[in-house]
């Protein structure tokens, strides 16, 4: 009974706390929960049979131990979802080598573990995985198998610059066996090397090794082809398109209009008519062609950095269809293969470009950049490898690309030059017509200085080539107009001659010894002679002080007759000849220097002197201003923009005159060789301009003669060494005919001048013949200059070129010792690029052509130099007059002050 009562109490007691829990639920839930747990634990305490089950479970734990690795196996099954683990699983399942190794290990493992045969498939699987791991340790890593490392091993087998006599044949089978790779891995390397002409295909799987000998030529050709295919503009277009897309996403529309409407007008380079994306033929899709195009992108890029996505969009046919996107990715991997080989060749290196959307893989060109197009024979890449270029497509690209250039950020300098030109034209002076294309020349030539300098160096290494009738020196490099002489107004009446006049090979300097001085003299008698000049038809106006020779070059040596040998500085002359298309003027007034630099002033005002000086050493065109002033003209310096390049006495030139002709031919003299002991004297070079003008007005008789000769790029420049040998009375013109004076002159002609009309006399009488004791019996050559307003002719014959072994000349005029300095205009020193003159045999007795010379009665005002042959955007009455009438009116107003002459706007009759 008691037991039953206890049992009933025990049955009732749990219900009571549950009722209590139901009642007191809202008051203290946590306490009730604890109380309920305790009450529940209380009746379960007598039932203690369950711990026995727990002990049984503990006893079975050793049996369940083999199950725990199964859980790890289950965890490992989640890993193959990653690409790397999935690749490992595929390799282990598919590779026959791995299966063979597993079979061999499985055959011997049961024999070794007979007693443990119970360790069934689970343990065998674990051991198999460890075997795969061991095999993976033995296998090379991905880095060891990389194409770049494989290419390095491949290149290490062959010399970079093999001997011309040694012929190396590459067998792809042998290379694949020696490097331990499949032959298909070698194909990628060989295709890229073949695109750069490092190897050439001989037979099937046989290639010949050439090395890097022809690599610069190949790269130069690839650069030219890349420029023809407009890759630079395509890259600029794609980059701008990305920027426009980013701006569009951020809601930043361009101020100049909707970018979408503009992009429709521009070229879509993904169209199939574009040659870069027209990868229709199988040949265009080959790795070799893609490699060449990839290299072109680097060669035409300004930054030499090409991002991979831009390269892929240009080089790979990117279709808008979704199924072709995988093909696009596959071809991007091919670009990586090309880049790996080029990296092994040390031509590019991998960099990362940080943009708005994050880092992008890119490659930077670290190979040679020291080449440009030249006239020497190049390897024809397009004929051997590249597909033919579609000319009609280029025209379509060029039209749209020109629209793009105006709004691309890198071409803002063109707009700047237009603004500066407008400032220059709006100054208070009469505008004249100027040559088409010369408006932005003064700025554009600065950016092209390196290209021109390299072209001159390349031309100098080629053959000596003949004079050309029409000279487009810069047309092969840039659409800029051919080198203008200077920007001169119609007062100079510069009109191109129809024929070349002089051409002198630099090796003709060897015809005489610089140490022996001049061996021939030319008499300058001021007689009017205009008979045979008409054959040249230069259309020159009367009274012009310039002769414009647009073709070949001229070498003149004005000797100092009392200083012994008139030996000009070889290095100085070499710099004259090395300054590419040169403009030479014989000038006396410093106002001429100011005129010459007037156009350069607007952009030079804000530049420091050092930067301006360095830029002037790079730019062209050039001008040698050689005064015939008396000794006090040393006080006359150039404008302040000339720096310390203003004056150099001819005595310093003669000091350096003992350089041999071979050193002149070498062309290695730099611009520093022009610097003499007096250049470093800033006190002489920084004289103000007002004293110059005062001296100019006080010294009317010592006026100037101009001889302006322009030579095309690569030909001999105009070489003049003028001694201090003219006094003002002998040079200064008057209203009547000028008095005669003697100038020792040597002109060495070049053989190409045969077909041109010449005036030749074996013995011309001249007033200098009595003084020329060292001349041969043939006699001197007449050198006639006009009176004012008349036309004269320069008669140069072979008698001016005499035996170099003859003695030095005596003094023809003891007064010809007064010229002390050589003033270089700032335009002259624009380009000191050194050129190696082409060697040619010495033709001493070859006749030369006729030059028209004119004498200016007045050194024109500083503002008178304006450009010619283009209508400016506004007209004043001064732009309508006859140049001769305007010049004569300026003769009458000669004595006015410089400030008045600067603001003077002369008027004349209508044309």
From Swiss-Prot:
Annotated positions of the Phosphoserine modification: 95, 410, 840
Main location: nucleus
Record's note on what induces expression: By p53/TP53 following DNA damage: expression is directly activated by p53/TP53 (at protein level).
Polar residues composition-biased segments: 672-685
SMART domains registered for this protein in UniProt: E2F_TDP (SM01372)
Pfam families, A to Z: E2F_TDP
DNA-binding region listed in the record: 142-211, 282-367
Compartments, record wording: Nucleus
Gene Ontology, cellular component aspect: chromatin; nuclear speck; nucleoplasm; RNA polymerase II transcription regulator complex
Function description: Atypical E2F transcription factor that participates in various processes such as angiogenesis, polyploidization of specialized cells and DNA damage response. Mainly acts as a transcription repressor that binds DNA independently of DP proteins and specifically recognizes the E2 recognition site 5'-TTTC[CG]CGC-3'. Directly represses transcription of classical E2F transcription factors such as E2F1. Acts as a regulator of S-phase by recognizing and binding the E2-related site 5'-TTCCCGCC-3' and mediating repression of G1/S-regulated genes.
Subunit-structure text: Homodimer and heterodimer: mainly forms homodimers and, to a lesser extent, heterodimers with E2F8. Dimerization is important for DNA-binding. Interacts with HIF1A. Interacts with MN1.
Entry's free-text remark on domains: In contrast to classical members of the E2F transcription factor, atypical members contain 2 DNA-binding domains and regulate transcription in a DP-independent manner. Both DNA-binding domains are required for DNA-binding and are proposed to form an intramolecular structure that is similar to the winged helix structure of the E2F-DP heterodimer.
Protein name: Transcription factor E2F7
Organismal lineage: Eukaryota, Metazoa, Chordata, Craniata, Vertebrata
């Amino acid at each position: 009974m008691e037991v039953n009562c206890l049992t009933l109490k025990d049955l009732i007691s749990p219900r009571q706390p549950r009722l209590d829990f139901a009642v007191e639920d809202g008051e203290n839930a946590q306490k009730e929960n604890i109380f309920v747990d305790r009450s529940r634990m209380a009746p379960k305490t007598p039932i203690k049979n369950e711990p026995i089950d727990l002990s049984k479970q503990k006893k079975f734990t050793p049996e369940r131990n083999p199950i725990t690795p199964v859980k790890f196996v289950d965890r490992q099954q989640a890993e193959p979802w990653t690409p790397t683990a999935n690749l490992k699983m595929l390799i282990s399942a598919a590779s026959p080598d791995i299966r063979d190794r597993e079979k061999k290990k499985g055959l011997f493992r049961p024999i070794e573990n007979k007693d443990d045969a119970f360790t069934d498939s689970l343990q065998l699987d674990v051991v198999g995985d460890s075997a795969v791991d061991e095999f993976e340790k033995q296998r090379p890593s991905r880095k060891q198998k990389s194409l770049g490392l494989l290419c390095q091993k491949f290149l290490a087998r062959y010399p970079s610059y093999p001997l011309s006599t040694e012929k190396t044949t590459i067998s792809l089978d042998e290379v694949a066996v020696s490097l331990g790779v499949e032959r298909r891995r070698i194909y990628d390397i060989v295709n890229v090397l073949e695109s750069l002409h490092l190897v050439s295909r001989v037979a099937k799987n046989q290639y010949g090794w050439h090395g890097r000998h022809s690599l610069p030529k190949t790269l130069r050709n690839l650069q030219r082809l890349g420029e023809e295919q407009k890759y630079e503009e395509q890259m600029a277009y794609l980059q701008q398109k990305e920027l426009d897309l980013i701006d569009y996403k951020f809601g930043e529309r361009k101020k100049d209009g909707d970018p979408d409407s503009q992009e429709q007008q521009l070229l879509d380079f993904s169209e199939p008519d574009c040659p870069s994306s027209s990868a229709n033929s199988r040949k265009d899709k080959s790795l070799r062609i893609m490699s060449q195009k990839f290299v072109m992108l680097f060669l035409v890029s300004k930054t030499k950095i090409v991002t991979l996505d831009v390269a892929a969009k240009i080089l790979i046919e990117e279709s808008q269809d979704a199924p072709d996107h995988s093909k696009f990715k596959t071809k991007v991997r091919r670009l990586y293969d090309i880049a790996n080989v080029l990296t092994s060749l040390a031509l590019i290196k991998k960099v990362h470009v940080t943009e708005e959307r994050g880092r992008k893989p890119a490659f930077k060109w670290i190979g040679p950049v020291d080449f440009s197009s030249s006239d020497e024979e190049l390897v024809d890449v397009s004929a051997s490898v590249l597909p033919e270029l579609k000319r009609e497509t280029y025209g379509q690209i060029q039209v749209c690309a020109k629209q793009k250039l105006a709004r691309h950020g890198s071409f803002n300098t063109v707009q700047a030059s237009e603004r500066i030109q407008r400032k220059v034209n709006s100054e208070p002076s009469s505008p004249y017509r100027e040559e088409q294309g010369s408006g932005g020349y003064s700025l554009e030539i600065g950016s092209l200085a390196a290209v021109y300098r390299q072209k001159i160096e390349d031309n100098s290494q080629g053959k000596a080539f003949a004079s050309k009738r029409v000279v487009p020196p810069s047309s092969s490099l840039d659409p800029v107009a051919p080198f203008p002489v200077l920007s001169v107004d119609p007062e100079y009446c510069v009109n191109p001659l129809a024929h070349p006049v002089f051409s002198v090979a630099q090796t003709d300097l060897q015809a005489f010894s610089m140490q022996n001085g001049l061996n021939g003299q030319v008499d300058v008698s001021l007689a009017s002679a205009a008979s045979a000049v008409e054959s040249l038809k230069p259309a020159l106006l009367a009274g012009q002080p310039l002769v414009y020779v647009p073709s070949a070059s001229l070498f003149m040596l004005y000797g100092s007759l009392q200083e012994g040998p008139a030996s000009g500085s070889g290095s100085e002359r070499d710099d004259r000849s090395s300054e590419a298309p040169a403009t030479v003027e014989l000038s006396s007034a410093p106002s001429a220097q100011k005129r010459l630099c007037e156009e350069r002033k607007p952009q030079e005002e804000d530049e420091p002197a050092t930067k301006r000086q360095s830029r002037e050493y790079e730019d062209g065109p050039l001008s040698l201003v050689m005064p015939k002033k008396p000794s006090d003209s040393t006080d006359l310096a150039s404008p302040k923009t000339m720096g310390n390049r203003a004056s150099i006495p001819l005595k310093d030139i003669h000091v350096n005159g003992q350089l041999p002709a071979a050193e002149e031919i070498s062309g290695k003299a730099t611009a520093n060789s022009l610097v003499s002991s007096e250049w470093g004297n800033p006190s002489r070079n920084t004289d103000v301009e007002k004293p110059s003008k005062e001296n100019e007005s006080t010294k009317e008789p010592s006026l100037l003669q101009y001889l302006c000769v322009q030579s095309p790029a690569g030909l001999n420049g105009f070489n003049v060494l003028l001694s201090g040998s003219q006094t003002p009375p002998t040079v200064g013109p008057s209203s009547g005919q000028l008095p005669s004076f003697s100038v020792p002159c040597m002109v060495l002609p070049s053989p190409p001048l045969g077909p041109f009309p010449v005036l030749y006399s074996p013995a011309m009488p001249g007033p200098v013949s009595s003084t020329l004791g060292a001349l041969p019996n043939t006699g001197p050559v007449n050198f006639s200059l006009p009176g004012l307003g008349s036309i004269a002719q320069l008669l140069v014959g072979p008698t001016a070129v005499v035996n170099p072994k003859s003695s030095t000349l005596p003094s023809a005029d003891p007064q010809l010792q007064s010229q002390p300095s050589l003033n270089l205009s700032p335009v002259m020193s624009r380009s000191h690029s050194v050129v190696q003159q082409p060697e040619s045999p010495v033709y001493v007795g070859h006749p030369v052509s006729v030059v028209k010379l004119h004498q200016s009665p007045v050194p024109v005002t500083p503002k008178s130099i304006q450009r010619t042959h283009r209508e400016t955007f506004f007209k004043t009455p001064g732009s309508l007059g006859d140049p001769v009438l305007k010049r004569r009116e300026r003769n009458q107003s000669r004595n006015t002050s410089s400030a008045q002459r600067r603001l003077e706007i002369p008027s004349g009759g209508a044309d």
